From Swiss-Prot:
It comes from Arabidopsis thaliana (Mouse-ear cress). Residues 10-73 form the GST C-terminal domain. GO terms for cellular component: eukaryotic translation elongation factor 1 complex. Keywords: Acetylation, Elongation factor, Protein biosynthesis. This is Elongation factor 1-delta 1. GO terms for molecular function: translation elongation factor activity. InterPro entries: eEF-1beta-like_sf, EF1B_bsu/dsu, EF1B_bsu/dsu_GNE, Glutathione-S-Trfase_C_sf, Transl_elong_EF1B/ribsomal_bS6, Transl_elong_EF1B_B/D_CS. The keyword Cell membrane does not apply. Pfam families: EF1_GNE. Signal peptide: none annotated. The modification N-acetylalanine is found at residue 2. Residues 85-108, 116-135 are annotated as: Disordered. The keyword Metal-binding does not apply.
């Protein structure tokens, strides 16, 4: 489990940045509700000073965007619960909130905001020290890329366009979720997410040499990189 102080303070951002030094996500090995909770607690994206937190924020933002979820909202209060505020999201529950804690245990069997034990803190420090001290060659990194692919006109068969795009297969390239987004005049563009192994795939080269040349350019007019984030 992970616990953070006020995430809109320097201390909170520093804690988050250190936590993400050896992790791609808040907990586990894929995006979860924990990432959404922390993402929502941040009033604005972390600055480049917090390299790891900024990288994580951009990645979660891209995942939300491809899922059709806006990163902004007008605020919400659920009857019988506290407003979603910095304190409610980022601060551990008060000691006398026994009933609320019991309900959370029934739902998840995990106290998401409990404090780290000494063993967990020590293990996290050892992992961070190991990463900094390691002289071994790092494994090739991965990146998450969101691409806009535009057709020639409103008569372009978008199903065939998507099939043509996904027909591009190479080592280190993994196609993900996609959706059609209206752009006007009856025309829709394909927005698609992919994951690449940085040392094996160049997105720019793939666009220039495969996505915009024959036979795929029968359907594809142009491609734009919307988001590019290290993971």
């Amino acid at each position: 489990m992970a616990a953070f102080p006020n995430l809109n303070s320097d201390a909170g951002l520093k804690k988050l940045d250190e936590h993400l030094l050896t992790r791609s996500y808040i907990t586990g090995y894929q995006a979860s509700k924990d990432d959404i909770t922390v993402f929502a607690a941040l009033a604005k994206p972390p600055t480049s000073q917090y390299v790891n937190a900024s990288r994580w924020y951009n990645h979660i933002d891209a995942l939300l965007r491809i899922s059709g979820v806006s990163a902004e909202g007008s605020g919400v209060i659920v009857e019988g619960s506290a407003p979603i505020t910095e304190e409610a999201v980022a601060t551990p529950p008060a000691a006398d909130s026994k009933d609320a804690a019991a309900d959370e245990e029934d739902d998840d069997d995990v106290d998401l905001f409990g404090e780290e034990t000494e063993e967990e803190k020590k293990a996290a420090e050892e992992r961070a020290a190991s990463v900094k001290a390691s002289t071994k060659k790092k494994e090739s990194g991965k990146s998450s890329v969101l691409i806009d692919i535009k057709p020639w006109d409103d008569e372009t068969d978008m199903k065939k366009l998507e099939e043509a795009v996904k027909s591009i297969q190479m080592e280190g390239l993994f196609w993900g979720a996609s959706k059609l987004v209206p752009v006007g005049y009856g025309i829709k563009k394909l927005q698609i997410l992919c994951t690449i192994v940085d040392d094996l795939v160049s997105i720019d080269t793939m666009i220039e040499e495969q996505l915009t040349v024959e036979p795929i350019n029968e359907y594809v007019q142009s491609c734009d990189i919307v988001a590019f984030n290290k993971i």
